[in-house]
Every structure is written in C-alpha cells, then in structure tokens.
C-alpha cells in the first residue's frame, strides 16, 4: 500500500498516511483516462450552433421568373441553397455532444489518474485545511509552506467557503469538494493537494 507523508498546514510533518491500494496503488490505464477526459470535455460543449435552412430564411415565397420561355434555368425560390442568401443544406443544428461511458470505466479512470499522481510524487496529503477568514495572502503563504508553485487542485471534505474564497484570486489554483473530484479536473492541474478527510471520502466511494 502506498505510504505518504502527512503534512500540517504550516508544512511540517504530521506523520504518515497509508493510502488504499485499490484506489491509489493500481497500474494506471492511460487509454481509459484519455477516453474519460474526452467524454467529460464533450459534455462541456454547448452545442448551440445553428444555421437556417431554406424554410427558415426570410423571403423567397414567390417564383423569381416563369418556368419556361426566358432562356434561363428554372428556379422556384430565391432562397434555395444555390442562391446567394439562400438556406443552408445539412448545416449544423443545436445538439448535445455528451455521451456516457460505463460506470466501471469512469471509476477505473479516476483510480488510474490518482495512482499516477502518487507514482509521479505529485500528490500531497494534508492533515487539515482551515482558514478563520477569507485571506488570499494566508493561502499563498500556505502554498509556499508546502512547496507548491505550479497549478494545483485542492480537494477538501465538503464545502469550505473560506478556503474557496481565499484561493479564488490565485491563478492556477482550484478548490473542490471531494464529491466533485473528476478525471478532467485532476488532469488539468500539475499537483493534487488533498486533505486526510477528503482521502477517506474518496476511498469510501472508490474502494
């Protein structure tokens, strides 16, 4: 089972924590991780693109010239697709790009990316993380204490308003509750900082 140092908020050592092998110690499956990231990114697409077909373009109700006798090609409407300003054939319409992957695949992906962070020594476990008031300066000092100077995802147990507000103005820092942890969020950040209570919640769901 993976063992990591447990850090206090001031960066000092608070002992060791043993992580669940089935969540943080599996052989990472990169293919599954990529599949889930693509699925989650597809779900974020708005899909609001829209063009007008010939029935939606304004005008074109009258036949532009008579059928025969003019020497010109027959036309039924000035809004048919070959005309300038005409309707579009087979153009994009509003749609959802979301698609679901099996639950087993999604669970394997989150376990894989968590295990990758452990293997790459990019997972930091905290004894706890609390702030009496929203203070960006204090949060920046905390990051310095634990030697984090890159993009970091901070996972806490449940909602923590003071922590979220303290981190809001720091570029590259995201705070989420343990229930919202996702493959895409973990992949977007270089380091994963997670509290001991959040580890227990994640293990409870995934183990």
UniProtKB/Swiss-Prot annotation:
Keywords: Ribonucleoprotein, Ribosomal protein, RNA-binding, rRNA-binding. Transmembrane segments: none annotated. One of its GO terms (molecular function) is structural constituent of ribosome. One of its GO terms (cellular component) is ribonucleoprotein complex. Pfam families: Ribosomal_L4. Residues 47-78 are annotated as: Disordered. SUPFAM superfamilies: Ribosomal protein L4 (SSF52166). The keyword rRNA-binding applies. GO terms for biological process: translation. It comes from the Bacteria. Residues 60-71 have a biased composition (Basic residues). Belongs to the universal ribosomal protein uL4 family. PANTHER family: 50S RIBOSOMAL PROTEIN L4, LARGE RIBOSOMAL SUBUNIT PROTEIN UL4M. Part of the 50S ribosomal subunit. One of the primary rRNA binding proteins, this protein initially binds near the 5'-end of the 23S rRNA. It is important during the early stages of 50S assembly. It makes multiple contacts with different domains of the 23S rRNA in the assembled 50S subunit and ribosome. Forms part of the polypeptide exit tunnel. This is Large ribosomal subunit protein uL4.
């Amino acid at each position: 089972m993976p063992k990591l140092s447990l850090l206090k908020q001031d960066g000092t050592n608070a002992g060791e924590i043993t992580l669940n092998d089935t969540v943080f110690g599996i052989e990472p499956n990169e293919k599954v991780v990529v599949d889930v990231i693509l699925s989650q990114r597809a779900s974020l697409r708005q899909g609001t693109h829209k063009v007008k077909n010939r029935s939606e373009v304004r005008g074109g109700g009258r036949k532009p010239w008579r059928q025969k006798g003019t020497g010109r090609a027959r036309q039924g409407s000035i809004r048919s697709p070959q005309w300038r300003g005409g309707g579009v054939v087979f153009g994009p319409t509003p749609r959802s790009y979301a698609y679901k992957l099996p639950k087993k695949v999604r669970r394997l992906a989150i376990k894989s990316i968590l295990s990758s962070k452990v293997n790459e020594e990019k997972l930091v476990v905290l004894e706890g993380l609390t702030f009496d008031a929203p203070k960006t300066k204090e949060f920046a000092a905390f990051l310095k204490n634990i030697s984090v100077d890159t993009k970091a995802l901070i996972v806490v147990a449940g909602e923590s308003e003071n922590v979220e507000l303290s981190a809001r103005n720091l570029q590259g820092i995201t705070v989420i509750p343990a229930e919202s942890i996702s493959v895409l969020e973990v992949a977007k950040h270089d380091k994963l900082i997670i509290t001991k209570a959040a580890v227990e919640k994640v293990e409870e769901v995934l183990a």
